[in-house]
């Protein structure tokens, strides 16, 4: 296996793990009887780990261990933890196992990037290919559950004639109730097994030694210098909008699965439970295609309008959720906007930071925006979304999906308008753009 193939397969497994359990956890936790506050604690294990990672664990791992060995150990322990989540149904064991998994998994996201960048000669050419392996891993994680989450008793009772008729029945016979809850446990088993496979495979990755800190290097000073850059209005605006967009992005994950699976009579889309994960992966397929045209779009539209389109993609999707849930084909098709939202905003933010921040502050600046994207924005959404769903927009068991989706719709619209009106970066894309105090 070539080096590029090994690095791509590393990314495939890395994101298969995350993609296996994330889409269905938001409906699984309520099915276990967890309260909104308990759901919030479990869901916030990931952003808490992201925040800890940005300030401590990522740097600790990067400086003290060879990357491939850290990856192996993290996925052995983290894999056991996520595997255990499939066999517990009380709050404290589930929360502790999820927290252990996330504390070990989150640093591996940056570690896999470090391994990849350390062993490719042309990052601009090769890294997108390697990273696409991660997107394919996320998509692939959904495929087995199209069949695992099938109500096979109903399929057998249907007594269909011919393979095509049988397959149609299979694909339209999703599990419900306790049967769905029990089958969802397999998402954690799949994530755990993939973790063990990646742990073993890590030993065959190219050796990546720890990064030694040069004498006189002050990491906290670099963070402080990056934070000082928020005094520039265009960076402050982008920072705030990034928080809002991350909040909206995580509303999508919190609510979409349950919305897709709810019956039409209850205001949902009525998609069979075994199709929820595949439908949500439409966005990942679109992400691959959107990333291919991102460079062209940036040249044509520039930073501001590319990002505005990315944020407005959320608004358009949630508008469809709120006002056209009865159009199942539209709801499925509009999942492509997930890829547009990711590429045109999050990916563009990373590129923007690389273009505008001074070289000695870029790494910390990326971390600063990651704090919003993976940390604080997700933390806010995971804290608020379960409460809004269960306590504010559910009355006597009836969910007001229109009111629920109006929240991220308004939030995304305000963020996009703010970006359009107040985000005015300098015309130049070099370090002097923010070194100059007159900016």
Language-model features and meaning:
Residues 1, 176, 205-241, 265-268, ...:
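Juxtamembrane intracellular "pre-TM" segments in multi-pass secondary transporters
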Residues 1-47, 234-242, 246-266, 275-279, ...:
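Helix-loop boundary and gating motifs at the non-cytosolic
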Residues 12, 81-85, 91-111, 115, ...:
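Hydrophobic core of transmembrane alpha-helices in multi-pass small-molecule transporters
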Residues 52-66, 149-150, 289-303, 389-390:
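Helix-to-loop junctions at the C-terminal end of transmembrane segments
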Residues 69-84, 305-320:
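Structural signature of the two symmetry-related core transmembrane helices
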Residues 85-86, 194-206, 404-439:
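Multi-pass alpha-helical transporter architecture, strongest
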Residues 150-193, 387-412:
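A membrane-interface helix-boundary motif in multi-pass transporters
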Residues 157-168, 203-224, 428-436:
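Flexible cytoplasmic inter-helical loops of multi-pass small-molecule transporters
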């Amino acid at each position: 296996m070539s080096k590029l193939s090994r690095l791509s397969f590393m990314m495939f497994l890395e994101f298969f793990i995350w993609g296996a359990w994330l889409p269905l956890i938001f409906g699984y936790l309520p099915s276990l009887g967890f309260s909104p506050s308990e759901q919030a604690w479990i869901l916030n294990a990931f952003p808490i780990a992201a925040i800890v990672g940005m300030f401590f664990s990522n740097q600790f791992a990067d400086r003290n261990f060879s990357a491939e060995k850290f990856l192996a150990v993290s996925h052995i322990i983290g894999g056991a933890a996520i595997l255990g989540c499939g066999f517990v149904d009380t709050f404290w064991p589930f929360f502790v196992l999820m927290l252990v998994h996330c504390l070990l998994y989150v640093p591996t996201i940056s570690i896999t990037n470090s391994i990849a960048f350390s062993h490719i000669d042309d990052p601009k050419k090769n890294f997108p290919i390697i990273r696409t392996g991660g997107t394919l891993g996320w998509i692939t994680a959904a495929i087995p559950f199209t069949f695992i989450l099938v109500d096979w008793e109903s399929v057998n009772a249907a007594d269909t004639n011919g393979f095509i008729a049988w397959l149609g029945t299979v694909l339209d016979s999703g599990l419900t109730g306790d049967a769905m809850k029990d089958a969802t446990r397999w998402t954690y088993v799949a994530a755990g097994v993939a973790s063990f496979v990646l742990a073993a495979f890590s030993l065959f990755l190219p050796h990546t030694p720890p990064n030694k800190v040069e004498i006189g290097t002050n990491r906290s000073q670099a963070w402080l210098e990056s934070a000082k850059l928020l005094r520039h209005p265009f960076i402050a605006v982008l920072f705030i909008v990034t928080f809002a967009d991350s909040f909206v992005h995580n509303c999508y994950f919190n609510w979409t699965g349950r919305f897709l699976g709810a019956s039409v009579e209850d205001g949902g889309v009525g998609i069979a439970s075994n199709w929820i994960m595949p439908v949500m992966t439409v966005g990942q397929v679109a992400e691959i295609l959107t990333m291919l045209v991102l460079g062209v779009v940036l040249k044509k539209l520039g930073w501001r309008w590319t990002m505005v389109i990315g944020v407005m993609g959320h608004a358009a999707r949630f508008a469809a959720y709120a006002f056209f849930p009865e159009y199942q084909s539209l709801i499925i098709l509009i999942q492509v906007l997930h890829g547009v939202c990711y590429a045109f905003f999050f990916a563009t933010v990373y590129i923007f930071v690389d273009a505008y921040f001074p070289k000695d502050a870029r790494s910390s600046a990326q971390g600063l925006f990651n704090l919003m994207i993976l940390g604080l924005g997700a933390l806010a959404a995971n804290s608020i979304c379960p409460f809004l769903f269960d306590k504010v927009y559910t009355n006597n068991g009836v969910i007001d999906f229109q009111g629920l989706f109006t929240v991220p719709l308004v939030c995304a619209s305000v963020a996009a308008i703010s970006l359009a009106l107040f985000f005015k970066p300098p015309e130049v894309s070099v370090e002097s753009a923010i070194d100059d105090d007159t900016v």
